[in-house]
């Protein structure tokens, strides 16, 4: 079951988070029209499934929520991602993941991060405080089999945590992205910063089971070949092509089969879901 743990965490990092970038030292361009793609009270549910030949089984669910809080006298966004395996799968391998981020109302500048991951007998806790002036992330990292470690992680202009990255991605300047452009992506997790390559593919109408057909922006993410991911293939990511920029799907090729995520339900969106061009008919 170690492979499942690595797979779900890797997909969480690469499929939902690693979309901030640096190209020639610059981050991926953000929209400048002042439109917020999310609002307090938004709730997005993702279904995560494993596919192998004719076998397709939902094994986990992720829930993303948004609100606003006060942090050290500053009003900030607070976002949370909670992921857990399905009840039937808990018998084989139980996963409970919580990721929380606090970031500035303007500019998505991170302030604080908390991670609590419980996966089988594995348990990890990350607590970050961002110090832009010092260029450091003050981190407390703890594992189930080790003492808590306090350290500083390098903090660059384009370095984010899992959930902050996800909401940064939703503020991308979609109209100015050019198909085929490759960006470097970075994300802080545990005691290090991880990188990969992100390629903007272009527009696509994507069918989501249970939801309908959605106009989307498609991205490819190059994954390092290893014990879980297959080499020479990209993970694929889709965001709705409207003012909400909702993540609607991802796919990551594995050594055996593939892991897929799809939008399951949504509520409290900041704008009309105009990207939903062909809703599923309710009988």
Language-model region placement:
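Positively charged n-region of N-terminal signal peptides that target proteins for export
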Residues: 1-6
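Active-site/ligand-binding surface loops and adjacent short beta/alpha elements
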Residues: 132-189
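Acidic, serine/threonine-rich low-complexity disordered tracts
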Residues: 23-132, 174-283
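Sec/Tat signal peptide C-region and signal peptidase I cleavage site
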Residues: 18-22
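Bacterial N-terminal signal peptides
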Residues: 7-17
């Amino acid at each position: 079951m170690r492979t499942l743990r690595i797979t779900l965490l890797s997909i969480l990092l690469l499929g939902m988070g690693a979309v901030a970038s640096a190209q020639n030292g610059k981050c991926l361009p953000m929209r400048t029209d002042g439109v917020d793609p999310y609002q307090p009270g938004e709730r997005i549910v993702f279904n995560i499934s494993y596919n192998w030949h004719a076998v397709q089984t939902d094994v986990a669910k992720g829930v993303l929520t948004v609100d606003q809080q006060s942090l050290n006298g500053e009003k900030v966004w607070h976002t949370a991602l909670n992921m857990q395996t399905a009840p039937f799968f808990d018998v084989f391998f139980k996963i409970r993941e919580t990721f929380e981020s606090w970031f500035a109302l303007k500019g998505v500048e991170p302030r604080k991060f908390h991670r609590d991951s419980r996966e089988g007998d594995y348990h990890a806790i990350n607590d970050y405080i961002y110090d832009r002036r010092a260029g450091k992330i003050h981190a407390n990292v703890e594992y189930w089999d080790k003492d808590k470690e306090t350290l500083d992680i390098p903090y660059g202009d384009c370095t984010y945590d899992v959930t902050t990255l996800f909401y940064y991605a939703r503020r991308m300047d979609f109209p100015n992205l050019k198909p085929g452009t490759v960006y470097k992506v970075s994300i802080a997790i545990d005691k290090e910063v991880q990188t990969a390559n992100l390629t903007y593919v272009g527009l696509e109408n994507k069918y989501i089971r249970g939801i309908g057909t959605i106009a989307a922006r498609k991205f490819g993410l190059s994954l390092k070949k290893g014990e879980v991911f297959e080499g020479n293939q990209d993970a694929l990511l889709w965001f709705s092509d409207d003012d909400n920029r909702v993540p609607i799907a991802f796919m990551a090729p594995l050594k055996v089969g593939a892991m897929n995520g799809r939008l399951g339900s949504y509520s409290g969106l900041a704008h009309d879901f105009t990207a939903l061009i062909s809703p599923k008919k309710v009988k």
